[in-house]
From Swiss-Prot:
Residues annotated as transmembrane: 33-53, 77-98, 113-133, 178-198, 226-246, 288-308, 320-340, 347-367
Principal location: mitochondrion
Binding site for heme b b566: H97, H196
Cofactors, names only: heme b
More info: Heme 1 (or BL or b562) is low-potential and absorbs at about 562 nm, and heme 2 (or BH or b566) is high-potential and absorbs at about 566 nm.
Gene source species: Galago gabonensis (Gabon Allen's galago)
Name of this chain's protein: Cytochrome b
Length: 379
């Protein structure tokens, strides 16, 4: 058996990636989220495939096909809610994974980090297009508002929006192409995840201390397969609790109303995992400025390795940076809350202050704090 595992071309690849992989002996539970993201992706592709068997991407039947899935298809309701809430779990794991990378300095693996940022964009695009497919009120108006942002691009904006719509408004052509892209993107994400792992295994994993773990490695199996299994059980417990007890907790009630282009919902808002970026978009009165801030709120992750001025990689022994990090985490939670509130005072002011704190913390305060810590630690 060992012979096959170590010499068969396919088994050898799996062996080097998941069984005999040399892994730092001190990585904490924060390193579990990579495997949990893989699990989420498998859940999403599987449930999505079964949903696609019954869904019809047509403006006249899309909403009723979702109703049909929930009422008439065997266990259709659980497949639908696993898919919807699985997306929320995906983003929780994604934010934790990125947060761990920021805290422990994993962004110094440049290729792995940049592929990760591309993956984040791909997952966000997939989730956005998936939100349009049920063809409820929030699906339609969310699609209209978010795609309309591209009209802020000078000279070519309006043409670009109409090209994406496939007409002069969000309609049948838009729904059909969003379904096609929503179906294909998870497979592209899978390919990108493999590239992400390929680059990671070139350098080996980081660890909480941030120093080289070459002298102290252990095999991935059985130590970390067992540890990952605990994460898997906890994730599935949380997901099934959500699906079976409160499946609509994270959804929007407006999406249970079929599309009516003549009736705008009082508060148009995306799913909870986009609210922080949506709050940044809304905090700037100028349309183009808002769109640029929205894009930069995610693209700023690419700059982080170049803004890292500390001599120590991890924040584990840097208390000042830790304070800033948790301030940034609290700020993102504030932005998420503001994104779900109506556009009126005091929410407008809070959103603007939180947006300024977000950008200034990453671009100014963190690099300066790193330099100060270098001085204090006499590097």
């Amino acid at each position: 058996m060992t012979n096959i595992r170590k010499h068969h071309p396919l088994a050898k690849m799996i062996n080097h990636s998941f069984i005999d992989l040399p892994t730092p002996s001190n990585i904490s539970s924060w390193w579990n989220f990579g495997s949990l993201l893989g699990l989420c992706l498998v859940i999403q592709i599987t449930t999505g495939l079964f949903l696609a068997m019954h869904y019809t991407p047509d403006t006249t039947t899309a909403f009723s096909s979702i109703t049909h899935i929930c009422r008439d298809v065997n266990y259709g309701w659980i497949i639908r809610y696993l898919h919807a809430n699985g997306a929320s779990m995906f983003f929780i794991c994604l934010f934790m994974h990125i947060g761990r990378g920021l805290y422990y300095g994993s962004f110094t693996f440049l290729e792995t980090w940049n592929i990760g940022v591309i993956l984040l964009f791909a997952v966000m695009a997939t989730a956005f297009m998936g939100y349009v497919l049920p063809w409820g009120q929030m699906s339609f108006w969310g699609a209209t508002v978010i795609t309309n942002l591209l009209s802020a691009i000078p000279y070519m904006g309006t043409n670009l929006v109409e090209w994406i719509w496939g007409g002069f408004s969000v309609d049948k052509a838009t729904l059909t192409r969003f379904f096609a892209f929503h179906f294909i993107l998870p497979f592209i994400i899978t390919a990108l995840a493999m590239v992400h792992l390929l680059f990671l295994h070139e350098t080996g994993s980081n660890n909480p201390s941030g120093i080289s773990s070459d002298p102290d490695k252990i095999p991935f199996h059985p130590y970390y397969t067992t540890k990952d299994l605990l994460g898997v059980i906890l994730l599935l417990l949380a997901l099934f609790s959500l699906v079976l007890f409160s499946p609509d907790l994270l959804g929007d009630p407006d999406n249970y109303t079929p599309v009516n282009p003549l009736n705008t919902p009082p508060h148009i808002k995306p799913e909870w995992y986009f609210l922080f970026a949506y709050a940044i978009l809304r905090s700037i009165p100028n349309k183009l400025g808002g769109v640029l801030a929205l894009a930069l709120s995610i693209l700023i992750l690419i700059l982080i390795p170049f803004l890292h001025t500390a001599k120590q990689r991890s924040m584990m022994f840097r208390p000042l940076s830790q304070c800033l990090y948790w301030m940034l985490a609290a700020d993102l939670l504030t932005l998420t809350w503001i994104g779900g509130q109506p556009v009126e005072n005091p929410f407008i002011t809070i959103g603007q202050v939180a947006s300024i704190i977000y950008f200034s913390t990453i671009l100014i305060l963190m690099p300066l704090t790193n330099l100060l810590e270098n001085k204090l630690l006499k590097w």
